[in-house]
Amino acid sequence: MRLNELSPPPGSRRARKRVGRGEGSGYGKTSGRGQKGAKARSGTKAYTTYEGGQMPLQRRLPRLKGEARGRHTPAHPKVYDPVNVGELAAVEGDTIGLDELRAAGLIRKKADTLVKILGDGEIDRPVTVRAHAFSRAAREKIEAAGGRAEVL
């Protein structure tokens, strides 16, 4: 066997499609491009998000918050887990922090949870409450009972 006798196995190599070489080839006249339109022209390519004139998806969806709407709308506003003063009465101990609230099932177990104490309900014992935010009414009720409201 010599190099000039080598050839690929039959059927492993495919001949190049020669378009525009007569009707009998099946790729004559319009060369497999159909009739008119942008796809029939040379050198044109529709961008990937083109939907044929239909309103594109990125224009159908509402605009995002943040920079897209203007600088005054935060893209990711702080989300607090609310806990009412009345719910604090069920928590044992003189100091109530995030761990105690989690153990009582009043806030989510996620570590980055922000907690705000709200003023609904009453508390009748002095406690030190540690949270990320307090409403004015909650702070007044905690301090009226002889406790302290500490912001984390």
UniProtKB/Swiss-Prot annotation:
GO BP field: translation
GO MF, one annotated term: rRNA binding
Assigned keywords, A-Z: Ribonucleoprotein, Ribosomal protein, RNA-binding, rRNA-binding
TM segment ranges: none
Keyword RNA-binding applies: yes
The UniProt record lists the keyword Ribonucleoprotein: yes
Signal peptide stretch: none
UniProt xrefs under Gene3D superfamilies: 3.100.10.10
Listed InterPro entries: Ribosomal_uL15, Ribosomal_uL15/eL18, Ribosomal_uL15/eL18_sf, Ribosomal_uL15_bac-type, Ribosomal_uL15_CS
Region (Disordered) residue spans: 1-79
Gene Ontology CC: cytosolic large ribosomal subunit
Biased composition (Gly residues): 22-35
Family: Belongs to the universal ribosomal protein uL15 family.
PANTHER family: 50S RIBOSOMAL PROTEIN L15 (PTHR12934), LARGE RIBOSOMAL SUBUNIT PROTEIN UL15M (PTHR12934:SF11)
NCBIfam families attached to this UniProt entry: rplO_bact (TIGR01071)
Function text: Binds to the 23S rRNA.
Record's subunit section: Part of the 50S ribosomal subunit.
Record's protein name: Large ribosomal subunit protein uL15
Species whose genome carries this gene: Rubrobacter xylanophilus (strain DSM 9941 / JCM 11954 / NBRC 16129 / PRD-1)
Upper taxonomic lineage: Bacteria, Bacillati, Actinomycetota, Rubrobacteria, Rubrobacterales
Gene: rplO
